[in-house]
């Protein structure tokens, strides 16, 4: 079970807002990640076929890359790799814009974190139901 992961007690807090004055970053735990630059595409207006975001360490670490996935239809509650050798995976719940991240640190330790990514969708240009979405803060 995901919740039995050893890292749950040390779950990493996330910050989805870019304006830290109105929403301070929590620095509890071993790692702090900032999620920004969320984007996605809904070709039929109801599901994503592409989404991504930037993830950056805010604790002095070197983590700073774009995590993304593409498919004919990205499924809610399914884990997607952030990329080769990243040791990070994500799952997205489109109905609540919820992001779940996990980072495999070792065979015994997995860090887990969650956040909500508010976003705005507009016409995408590839038909009446095509939408392009981007994060808002």
UniProtKB/Swiss-Prot annotation:
Residues 28-137 form the AA1-like domain. GO terms for cellular component: extracellular region. Pfam families: AltA1. Keywords: Allergen, Disulfide bond, Secreted, Signal. InterPro entries: AltA1 (IPR032382). It is found in: Secreted. Residues 1-11 form the signal peptide. Disulfide bonds join 67-82, 121-133. It comes from the Eukaryota. Its main location: secreted. On the 2D-gel the determined pI of this protein is: 4.0, its MW is: 18 kDa. Belongs to the ALTA1 family. Homodimer; disulfide-linked. This is Allergen Ulo b 1. It comes from Alternaria botrytis.
């Amino acid at each position: 079970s995901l919740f039995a992961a050893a890292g749950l007690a040390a779950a990493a807090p996330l910050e989805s807002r870019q304006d830290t004055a109105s929403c301070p970053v929590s620095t509890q735990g071993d790692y702090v990640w900032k999620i920004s630059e969320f984007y996605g595409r809904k070709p039929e207006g109801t599901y994503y076929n592409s989404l991504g975001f930037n993830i950056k360490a805010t604790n002095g670490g070197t983590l700073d890359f774009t995590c993304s996935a593409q498919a004919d239809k990205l499924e809610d509650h399914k884990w997607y790799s952030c990329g080769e050798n990243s040791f990070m995976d994500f799952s997205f719940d489109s109905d609540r814009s919820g992001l779940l991240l996990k980072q495999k640190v070792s065979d015994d330790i997995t860090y887990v974190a969650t956040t909500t990514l508010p976003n705005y969708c507009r016409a995408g240009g590839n038909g009446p139901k095509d939408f392009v979405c981007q994060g808002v803060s």
